[in-house]
Amino acid sequence: MRLALVQTPCKLGDKLENMRRMERMLDQADADVYLFSELFLTGYMCRDRHPLLAEPVDGKSVTRVQGMAEQRDCSIVFGMPTASDVYTGVVHNSAVAVSPDGTIQRYDKLVPANFGPFEERLYFTHGLSPVLFTLAGMKVGVVICYDLFFPEFLREYAVQGADLLVCISASPATSREQFERIFPARAAENTCYMAYANQVGAQLNMVFFGGSQAYGPRGDLLARCKYYEEDIAVVEVYQREVALARRMRPTLRDTIACATPSEAGQEKS
C-alpha cells in the first residue's frame, strides 16, 4: 500500500473550500490511500457550529469525496462531524473512509476530549466500539486524536489482525511532545505500522503543529511532514514486514496466550 499523509490548513466552517483543498492535495502525490486530519471537512474549532455542519455519511460531502476516490482509483480517509442516522440531534466526531468502488466505512471517536481548551463533549457523542477498516487490501485500525492515549483500543485492532494503525488528529503545538513519545510505542507494542495525520495552521486561538508521521512495525520512523507548514509524505506499507516483525517479537501471540484461562496457579475449592 502506498499511503499519503496529508496536512493542509482548513477553512473554518467552509466545507466546499475544504473539499477543494482536499482535491488539490490529492493531485500532489500518487497513493492508494490518502489520510487527512480530524474534522478536516469543517476545521476543528467550529465549536457550537459542529451540529449545524454535521451531515449523514451518505450526504452531499461524502458523495463528492466518493467521486474523487473513483476518479483517482484511491481510498480517502478524512474527519468530519456526522449526524446519527438513528438518533435525532446526535452528532459524532468521525473518521470516514471512502473507497474507489464507493464503499463507505466510518469510525466514531470513542473518547471525545474534554479538558483544558478542548470541549468536545459539549457537541459530540462518543462512539460505541472500535471499527476495523479494510483499505487497499489491508486491515486498518482507526482512532481519532485523544483515543491514542488509550492503548487498549489499538491493541484490540492488532489482535483483530490490523496491519496498520491510523490516527487522524487535531493536535495543538502544546501536545506535540506527548504525541511523539507515543507513536513509536504504539507501533512497536502492536507490531503494526502506525500513521498519523494532523491538522496544521491556526484556527482561532489554537495552533496545530502538523508533523504528520509514520512508523514501521518495529517503531522506526519512516516519514514526517514539516512542522507548521502544508506538506504531504508518502510511505510504503508492506504486510510482509508486519508478519516478520511479529515473528521476531511475538507480543500479540503472547497477549492472546495470556488472555486464555489456564488451570495453572488456580486454587482448588
Give the ranges of each region predicted by the language model.
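CN hydrolase (nitrilase-like) catalytic-core segments centered on the catalytic cysteine
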Residues: 57-77, 149-230
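C-terminal beta-strand edge segments of enzyme domains
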Residues: 106, 132, 199-269
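Active-site catalytic loop in hydrolytic enzyme cores
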Residues: 86-160, 172-181, 244-251
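Short, acidic/polar
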Residues: 16-26, 150-155
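Active-site-proximal beta-strand elements of phosphoester/diester hydrolases
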Residues: 1-10, 106, 139-147, 166
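Cys-nucleophile CN-hydrolase/nitrilase-fold catalytic domain and related Cys-dependent amidase chemistry
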Residues: 15, 23-100, 105-106, 172-185, ...
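Short Pro/Gly-enriched beta-strand edge/turn motifs at strand-loop
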Residues: 76-81, 110-118, 194-198
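Active-site beta-loop-alpha junctions enriched in small/polar residues
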Residues: 8-9, 81-83, 109-110, 145, ...
